[in-house]
Amino acid sequence: MRFRPSIVALLSVCFGLLTFLYSGSAFAVDKSQLTYDDIVNTGLANVCPEISSFTRGTIEVEPNTKYFVSDFCMEPQEYFVKEEPVNKRQKAEYVKGKVLTRQTTSLEQIRGSIAVGADGTLTFKEKDGIDFQPITVLLPGGEEVPFFFTVKNFTGTTEPGFTSINSSTDFVGDFNVPSYRGAGFLDPKARGLYTGYDNAVALPSAADKFRTNKKETPLGKGTLSLQVTQVDGSTGEIAGIFESEQPSDTDLGAKEPLDVKVRGIFYGRVDTDV
C-alpha cells in the first residue's frame, strides 16, 4: 500500500504525456522530427499538421499568377450517410456513423496549384499525392457502408475580388470518385469485370441477376468545400475545415450508391515556386 502514491504519480505522468502527444500541437504532428519508433502504432501518421498558433494572416496574390500547394493534408473527423426514411412523408436525412477503419483515413502529401484570375478569382486544382483512402462507416442500425474517400482531380474556385489568401477564402468545386473495387476484383462467386465467371456458378443468367452478374467500375462525382480559417503569411501555411459529399461503394455496380458526407480539417503550404 505504501507504493500507491508512487503509482498514482507515475500514471499521472503517463496520461499527461499522452494528452500532450494527441493535443494537436505543432510538435505532436511534426513528423519530420520524429523517428519511426515514435510514430508506429500511435496514430500520429493519421494526423494532419497544424499551424503552431492561431493566426489570421494573409498571403498576397497577384492576378494572372500561379501559386503551388504542397504537403496538403485532409483529416476526416465526422462521417454522415444519407438514409431513406421509413415514412414516405419524411425527407431523407444524414445519419452520423462510426468509422471502422483504423488510423488510415487521412489524405496527405497532396500537391496542387492555385491560379489567380484577372477578376481576383482563385482556382485550386489538385494534381497528385496520397489522395484516396478506402473507409468503412458503421451506421446506428448496424449497416456497414464502405466508400472511397478521395479528392482526385478536385477543381475549386472562390468568389471574385480576392487579392490575398485569408481567413475568408473558400474553395468550392467538384472531384472524381473512382470505383471502390478495381476491374480485376472477384466477388465471392468468382465474378469480375474482365476475369472470372460471367454469372454465378450453377445459376442461369436471369434478368433479376443481371445487375449482379454484369460488373462495372463507375466513375462518380463528389463536391468539396475548403474553408480557410488560419493563414501564416510568413511560412505560407494555410489551415481550415472541409466538407465533402460523395457516393459510396456500389459493389461493382450491383447496388445503388449512398450519399456520404465527410467533415474534418485540412492543412497545406502555398509557395510561388514548385
Curated annotation (Swiss-Prot):
Disruption of the gene: reported phenotype: No photoautotrophic growth, no oxygen evolution. Decreased growth rate at 30 degrees Celsius with 25 umol photons/m(2)/s, no growth in Ca(2+) depleted medium, decreased growth in Cl(-) depleted medium; further decreased in a double psbO-psbQ mutant. No dimeric PSII forms, PsbQ does not associate with PSII.
Topology term for the membrane: Peripheral membrane protein
SUPFAM superfamilies reported in the protein's UniProt record: OMPA-like (SSF56925)
Cellular compartment(s): Cellular thylakoid membrane
Protein keywords: Manganese, Membrane, Photosynthesis, Photosystem II, Signal, Thylakoid
Domain of life: Bacteria
GO cellular component, one term: photosystem II oxygen evolving complex
Molecular function, one GO term: oxygen evolving activity
Biological process annotations from GO: photosystem II assembly; photosystem II stabilization
Pfam families: MSP
InterPro entries: OMP/PagP_b-brl (IPR011250), PsbO (IPR002628)
Record Gene3D superfamilies: photosynthetic oxygen evolving center domain (3.30.2050.10), Photosystem II, cytochrome c-550 precursor (2.40.160.30)
Primary localization: membrane
Signal peptide: 1-28
Self-association state and partner proteins as the record states: PSII is composed of 1 copy each of membrane proteins PsbA, PsbB, PsbC, PsbD, PsbE, PsbF, PsbH, PsbI, PsbJ, PsbK, PsbL, PsbM, PsbT, PsbX, PsbY, PsbZ, Psb30/Ycf12, peripheral proteins PsbO, CyanoQ (PsbQ), PsbU, PsbV and a large number of cofactors. It forms dimeric complexes. Contacts PsbQ.
Family designation: Belongs to the PsbO family.
Function: One of the extrinsic, lumenal subunits of photosystem II (PSII), which stabilize and protect the oxygen-evolving complex. PSII is a light-driven water plastoquinone oxidoreductase, using light energy to abstract electrons from H(2)O, generating a proton gradient subsequently used for ATP formation. Required for dimerization of PSII and for binding of PsbQ to PSII.
Protein name per its UniProtKB record: Photosystem II extrinsic protein O
